[in-house]
């Protein structure tokens, strides 16, 4: 039985969706083994993301432990918060992309990234300043030049200035290797034979590459590349491949404004965190 009509029928939304939003998918099921020290990592990621970008933040939490969820609800208080069972990172990101209007500038990040002030504004500058951009990252690693930059280089060859060589500090590659659990010396030996591709267009300079663990885009562009998966952590190289295959540019800021932390904050990483916040974070 129903009496009358819902008073919201035919009414416009009272809430206006933001034109820009930074999002993180979190997953901390426990604080044991691999996850033993990750609570601090996730908290640092979210604090630095908000500290470095004056935009709303959305967190999609995939089945995390109560301690993280209590912190999200009581202390961090993101502008948008979804608490769900673990539906998988890729499926969460697909849902996030579909939640916002197609023109929305939206950032996607894993929960173990560190951000410097200005990461958002510089990424948006490239997204708006270059044509047909699919992904812009704030964290460059030379290894990423192997990941689907054909369309970027093809476009740049005719429309921009391209420089090829070793431009990034070796310390950045050491940070990369340590953050993903690689042995540093073999990694450095490998990347010394690889080149960076620096692109300059209308006074803006960036690198050809993007990281699927952290990037900004437009919701309507990236939404078509996320698909439902029965895997908790789907390998995302296919995302890179499809964006590149459709002719979109994949770019990274010329200054390092983000960093992958890994699952442990050691003394060296703590120095990076202090630098990112402009002081030692408390």
PLM regions and their residue ranges:
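C-terminal catalytic/acceptor-binding lobe
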Residues: 1-10, 14-17, 185-282
